[in-house]
């Protein structure tokens, strides 16, 4: 009679912490990198989930704006130029990534007002 115990827990299919949190970014990998990076002696259980959520949100925001920039240029593939245009035209992302240089990004189109041709007024007849 003894030996089996009282019906232990049946292990179901394992769920990743990313899927539990409803995220695409890897919570387990971020946790491992936080531990190995010597940022602190200990890392809480919620910290990698929060960080993964923030990183996923920022990536989605940049990709959405870059996709819009690619569509405006009638392209189906996002290139570094589209990322540059997306980031520099958005006030908050530009402030966040002000010190970042994007390779092959180019510059924003900007012509000084002084250099534009003068508007001539024709005499009304």
Swiss-Prot record:
A single MF term (Gene Ontology): structural constituent of chromatin
Domain of life: Eukaryota
Keywords: Acetylation, Chromosome, DNA-binding, Methylation, Nucleosome core, Nucleus
N5-methylglutamine: modified positions: 104
InterPro entries per record: Histone-fold, Histone_H2A, Histone_H2A/H2B/H3, Histone_H2A_C, Histone_H2A_CS
GO cellular component terms, semicolon-separated: nucleosome; nucleus
Annotated region (Disordered), positions in chain: 1-23
CDD domains (alphabetical): HFD_H2A
Biased composition (Basic residues): 1-18
Compartments in which it is found: Nucleus; Chromosome
Sites of N-acetylserine modification: 2
Pfam family name, one: Histone
Entry-linked PANTHER family: HISTONE H2A
Family: Belongs to the histone H2A family.
SUBUNIT field: The nucleosome is a histone octamer containing two molecules each of H2A, H2B, H3 and H4 assembled in one H3-H4 heterotetramer and two H2A-H2B heterodimers. The octamer wraps approximately 147 bp of DNA.
Function: Core component of nucleosome. Nucleosomes wrap and compact DNA into chromatin, limiting DNA accessibility to the cellular machineries which require DNA as a template. Histones thereby play a central role in transcription regulation, DNA repair, DNA replication and chromosomal stability. DNA accessibility is regulated via a complex set of post-translational modifications of histones, also called histone code, and nucleosome remodeling.
Name used for this protein in its record: Histone H2A
Lineage: Eukaryota, Metazoa, Spiralia, Lophotrochozoa, Mollusca
């Amino acid at each position: 009679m003894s030996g089996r115990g009282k019906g232990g827990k049946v292990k179901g299919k394992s769920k990743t912490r990313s899927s539990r949190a409803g995220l695409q970014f890897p919570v387990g990998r971020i946790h491992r990198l936080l531990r190995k990076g010597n940022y602190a002696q200990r890392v809480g259980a919620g910290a990698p989930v929060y960080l993964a959520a923030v990183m996923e949100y920022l990536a989605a925001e940049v990709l959405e704006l870059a996709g819009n920039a690619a569509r405006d240029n009638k392209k189906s593939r996002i290139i570094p130029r589209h990322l540059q245009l997306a980031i520099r035209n958005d006030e908050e992302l530009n402030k966040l990534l002000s010190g970042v240089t994007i390779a092959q990004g180019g510059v924003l189109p900007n012509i000084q007002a002084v250099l534009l041709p003068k508007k001539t007024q024709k005499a009304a007849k």
